[in-house]
């Protein structure tokens, strides 16, 4: 998170940390005691999930640690985009979401809570907050990762603001959010984490420019409400 600040410790009980072995790779959101929603591009063969975390380098008695028993990326996400390649015009990062089934249900506590799925669309002009343990330095070649979860206020912008800024496709299944003045953004390591608007989960951090936080180059977030039925059906079909 660029241009943000440490989140209040007890303000994010649904925030998940998605690990590859011992390295945090992405954020996520607890949407059911046994399911975490994250970005499809966070997929790997050994995801683990930590809940109830705030400072990743402190021993926190609120923490709960899980293995992932099943990873279900959205079937329409183009996995070939994950191979190293030069970005081409009109690449399409749509459907960038994935459900992770925990090896056992989370214990619901003050520090670990389920976030409901959205029931109505967010309006352009709404100020939302993005959360993550991603880089606080905008230069992707030299990321600087914070100990504590960071929060930043970002505005929901017209899709045209993103369309004008990026060569990859901007579609109706994405939210465009940021600060046109620059200096506030999500960044590498924030992927899959939540964009919360008026207390409602509306987006998952998906993709953006490099470096992060450039003026007139807002980032893209998977529009969760577009996938509500898929999320509910996937959880129901894999009890």
From Swiss-Prot:
Cystine bridges: 7-151, 26-42, 128-197, 162-176, 187-212
Assigned EC number: 3.4.21.35
Keyword Hydrolase: yes
List of glycosylated residues: 78, 169
Catalytic activity: Preferential cleavage of Arg-|-Xaa bonds in small molecule substrates. Highly selective action to release kallidin (lysyl-bradykinin) from kininogen involves hydrolysis of Met-|-Xaa or Leu-|-Xaa
Positions annotated as active site in the UniProt record: 41, 96, 191
UniProt keyword list: Disulfide bond, Glycoprotein, Hydrolase, Protease, Serine protease
Pfam family of the protein (one): Trypsin
InterPro entries: Peptidase_S1_PA (IPR009003), Peptidase_S1_PA_chymotrypsin (IPR043504), Peptidase_S1A (IPR001314), Trypsin_dom (IPR001254), TRYPSIN_HIS (IPR018114), TRYPSIN_SER (IPR033116)
UniProt similarity note: Belongs to the peptidase S1 family. Kallikrein subfamily.
Protein name: Glandular kallikrein, prostatic
Native species: Cavia porcellus
């Amino acid at each position: 998170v660029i241009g943000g600040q440490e989140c209040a410790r007890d303000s994010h009980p649904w925030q998940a940390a998605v690990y590859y072995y011992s390295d945090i790779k992405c954020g996520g959101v607890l949407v059911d005691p046994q399911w975490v929603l994250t970005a499809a591009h966070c997929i790997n063969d050994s995801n683990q999930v930590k809940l109830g975390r705030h400072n990743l380098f402190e021993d926190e008695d609120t923490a709960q640690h899980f293995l992932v028993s099943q990873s279900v990326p959205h079937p329409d996400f183009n996995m070939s985009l994950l191979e190293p390649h030069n970005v081409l015009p009109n690449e399409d990062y749509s459907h960038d979401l994935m459900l992770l089934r925990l090896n056992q249900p989370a214990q619901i506590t003050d520090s670990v809570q389920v976030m409901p799925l959205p029931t109505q669309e967010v309006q352009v002009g709404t100020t939302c907050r993005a959360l993550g343990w991603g880089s606080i330095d905008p230069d992707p070649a030299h990321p600087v990762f914070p100990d504590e979860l960071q929060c930043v206020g970002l505005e929901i912008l017209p899709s045209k603001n993103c369309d004008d800024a990026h060569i990859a496709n901007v579609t109706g299944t994405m939210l465009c959010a940021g600060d046109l003045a620059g200096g506030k953004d999500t960044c590498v390591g924030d992927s899959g984490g939540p964009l919360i608007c008026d207390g409602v989960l509306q987006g998952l951090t998906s993709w953006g420019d490099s470096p992060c936080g450039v003026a007139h180059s807002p980032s893209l977030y998977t529009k969760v409400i577009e996938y509500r039925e898929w999320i509910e059906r996937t959880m129901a079909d894999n009890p």
